[in-house]
Design a protein with these regions (language model features):
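Extended cationic-aromatic binding surfaces that line active-site or macromolecule-binding grooves
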Residues: 14-72
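Accessory, usually C-terminal, subdomains that scaffold auxiliary metal cofactors
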Residues: 143-229
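Short, hydrophobic/amphipathic alpha-helical patches that form generic packing surfaces
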Residues: 19-43, 95-98, 141, 168, ...
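Single conserved hydrophobic/aromatic residue that forms the stacking wall/gate
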Residues: 2-13
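Conserved aromatic-histidine-acidic binding/catalytic patches
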Residues: 18, 22, 36, 81-88, ...
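A general alpha-helix detector
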Residues: 29-33, 76, 120-124, 165, ...
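Alpha-helical ds-nucleic-acid-binding substructure associated with the helix-hairpin-helix region
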Residues: 52-146
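Short runs of predominantly hydrophobic/aromatic residues within well-ordered alpha helices
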Residues: 22-31, 89-90, 136, 162-163, ...
């Protein structure tokens, strides 16, 4: 979710001549989000920023397709940004660059704006390799939050991109309660949390994008590991 930080472009971007809401900005945001698997978002973001600063071509779909093999992607990308699953990230990086080149003129912005209907846009995002409900929802939130597409509607029909931290928060706040003394398997309740948080937002007429930001702040900084127990 730290990919939204890229709306406030830092020195790395300025040195590379990157303007806010430009194609390069979109490429960085899209490819960075692909690595949000079991990695603390702030660390992921910083490593991706360093990689972009040293070699922005690694985020350019045309260049990726024409120049990188899977082994290259593992060595030059996955290992540099500390991917939990280096081979899988490399496969996703290459495959998704191919999709962007073939269907969106190598420009993620065309994909971001391919529909204003959130349900269709999330379906498009999830058609990319390695993008499921969580990462798709995270990218959707970033697309809206950064301003790449300000006309998205039906957001209330898209599930909130939660993870184990959000599930843990639900129990910590007693939004979820189970009637036994066994240690809770928080992973088991992630999907339920996703559905219930969306229902609560819709009942209260609250945009889940705002709730998701609050949950991320709590989950990533205040409710991690033994801090929640």
């Amino acid at each position: 979710r730290d990919v939204e930080r890229s709306r406030g472009l830092g020195d790395v971007y300025k040195r590379q001549g990157v303007n806010q809401l430009s194609k390069k900005h979109a490429c960085f945001m899209f490819f960075t989000a692909l690595n949000d698997h079991g990695t603390k978002s702030s660390i992921m973001y910083e490593k991706s920023k360093e990689l972009f600063g040293s070699n922005p071509n690694l985020f350019e779909p045309n260049w990726i397709v024409e120049n990188l093999s899977e082994n290259d992607a593992v060595e030059l990308i996955s290992k540099k940004i500390g991917a939990q699953y280096p081979q899988q990230l490399a496969k996703s990086w290459l495959k998704n660059a191919e999709i962007l080149k073939e269907f969106y003129n190598s420009n993620p912005i065309e994909m971001f704006c391919s529909s204003n209907d959130a349900t269709k846009l999330i379906a498009t995002l999830k058609s990319f390799r390695g993008v499921g409900t969580k990462i798709g929802g995270m990218i959707l939130r970033a697309i809206i939050g950064t301003g790449f597409n300000k006309n998205v509607f039906n957001i209330e029909k898209v599930l909130v991109p939660v993870d184990i931290h959000d599930s843990r928060i639900m129990f910590l706040t007693e939004s979820f309660v189970i009637n036994n003394n066994e240690k809770v398997n928080y992973y088991k309740y992630v999907d339920i949390a996703q559905t219930e948080i969306l229902k609560a937002c819709n009942r209260c007429n609250i945009n889940w994008l705002d709730v998701d930001r609050a949950l991320w702040l709590t989950g990533s900084n205040g409710c991690v590991y033994d801090k929640c127990d």
